[in-house]
Amino acid sequence: SIFFRIVFFLVCMLYFIHGLNGSPREWNVFTEYFTERGFDCEAINLKNGLDLKRVHFKDYVEKVSGLVSNDDILIGHSMGGLIVQKVAEETIVKAGVCICPAAPNDIPMKTVPWWRQIRYLPFMLFGIPFKPSFGLVKDVFLSGWDEEKQRKIYNRLQRQSSHVTYEVMKQKISVDEKKISCPLYFIGRKEDVTIPLKIVKRIAQKYHSNFDAVS
């Protein structure tokens, strides 16, 4: 497994950070795998204890920063990968692993078509947490998958802060790579249509980091 590339670190904890509409349960297979091999693991519930009507991306960054020490490794997917980048900028950790990460504002990503964004304007304007429709998720984020699998994934998704959704999807988050002192490692998925390999590669290049692609 490519994850053995990080095993040479002597760590106190492996912290796993979920994506935008995800939850800690998406990491169950990973935490079980690494726990069986002697690692202490925690899948962070970003939303726990926070008011989704008020929370912003920086609140998630502060939450993760408050949990980790400089001996720990952060592993994040999608938005969680962007949180890894931001935490590494603001504090000291052993290393970070970013899986199909959302990009900071200097690396343009594919956006949701404007006409599919209109229905979510009231949520954005009034700070109402929401979960995108199955149609949007199916067509934009899970295209190419069979519908049974699309439904299974969609049913696991959770509501997210409209503020955080706006900040991530509209790429309002900046990261100063010169402030990052730990190694970062990036993983992209060959078939990913939301965050294509070329985007993951550009993010890795921003930090002069290693990059791998998986099927």
Where are these predicted regions, by residue range?
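Conserved alpha/beta-hydrolase "acid-adjacent" motif
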Residues: 193-199
